[in-house]
Amino acid sequence: MQLWQLNPQARWRRTLKGGAALLPETAATVELDAEAFTAVSLLKTPLTARRLRHQLIAQFNRNFTLAETDILLRDLAAQGFLVESRAEQSASSVPGSASPGSQSHAPESVHLQLNNVCNLRCPSCYLGLHEDDRDLLSLARLCALIDECAEMGVFQLALGGGEALLSPKFAPVARYARQRGLVPNVTTNGWLITEKLLDEVQGSLGELRLSLNDAVTVNKALLEEKAALLRARRMRFGFNLIVTQRNLNRLSELLEWACAQGAATINLIRPKPAPGNDRWYTDNALTRADAARLLAVLKDMEPLFTQTALTVDCAFSFLFHGQSARQLESRGVAGCAMGERFATIKWNGDVYPCSHLHGEEFRAGSVLSESFRDIWERSQVFTKLRRDLPQVNGHCGGCAHNAFCKGCRAAMQQRTGDWLAADTDCPVPVAQAQTKALI
């Protein structure tokens, strides 16, 4: 009989809905419901499908067919999360492997702000930089944070700033994160990328994201040069692009250009209001009509994305309205997941549920005075947010798509003063009203 066990290289974490797994080498992830995650947790020792089925029946007191158990095992094996086993081996015996069930609920990704300074002054910036780069988070403290994240089961570390590459701690942090089994990624404006710097992080970064910003205040020739350096080293890279009123008419051209550079991914970002960028936001924010146009452009451009993956940030989840739960899950669409899948540690040690939330009422604690785990698990801010997030107001609250969207809470907080307000940019209510008018 065929025996299955966990891939020793896979990392696992609990989620509020079940669990998830990551293969650090490829950054491939999979989401599992509670039953599937329990099934996987039983594979810390090798089992056959038949034996696993018997244990699941005993645990959940319901019938599991051998066919559905076998399908689950073979599907996870095809994705690389399970491997065929010899009876004497156990995945949990592999040093450094994180097995399911060994952690409490943990964030999938932690955004770690290495500094608060930048060599550019982009009008779209949401951070409100203050040119304050005091060494509040020493390299030793950052490494201790990485240790905590690894022990909790965090998958990815999103390194940022400011401009992360200005920090002398960037390369050591990236290397140490990889050593601890996390996948460190970084977003940068690209100006400071050099051969020497790439030597220091070769083999450590999961992906380097070059910021196209809003494609107005960016030097495309510079980004082409940096992309060529990354291609020559076979380092995985992508682009971040803020989609705005001003560049929506050029979006097809920009996507074609980014694909031509050899990008592994292109991530489209929704404009977000923040202290200090009010004028830019007013001039560039997408209307509901713009959002509908964006969806049409993406559908037309779909054949382009054979070698390059196109992703959107969670604030654009309303673009997928109308798709089934299975389709949304397969695309990784989970909507606003601040405080559940993500958290931010700012340059001064303050912890927030989201990089785009500002204000003392959203400050969950400081890693200068307490552990990140304690903040994540016990902070009143996170507890209240997780309780209230499903209860968004207006059309968002009554939307059938709510579980996979919830709008952009940070944008609504800045715009209306109420983080639970209905998302005013969502095109779905207009489309529904137009449909009703035709009936």
Where are these regions (language model features)?
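Flexible mid-to-C-terminal extensions adjoining Fe-S/redox cofactors in radical SAM and related proteins
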Residues: 356-439
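Canonical Radical SAM [4Fe-4S] cluster-binding loop centered on the CxxxCxxC motif
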Residues: 103-140
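Acidic, low-complexity/disordered tracts enriched in E/D and polar residues
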Residues: 1-43
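A broadly conserved sequence feature marking short terminus-proximal activation segments
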Residues: 70-93, 350-378, 382
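Long, charge-rich, low-complexity alpha-helical segments
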Residues: 28-111, 398
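Short pre-active-site segment immediately N-terminal to redox-active cysteine/selenocysteine motifs
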Residues: 117-121, 129, 347, 395, ...
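Radical SAM/AdoMet-radical enzyme domain recognition
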Residues: 127, 136-160, 166-287
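A C-terminal junction/extension of Radical SAM enzymes
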Residues: 1-3, 274-360, 390-393, 404
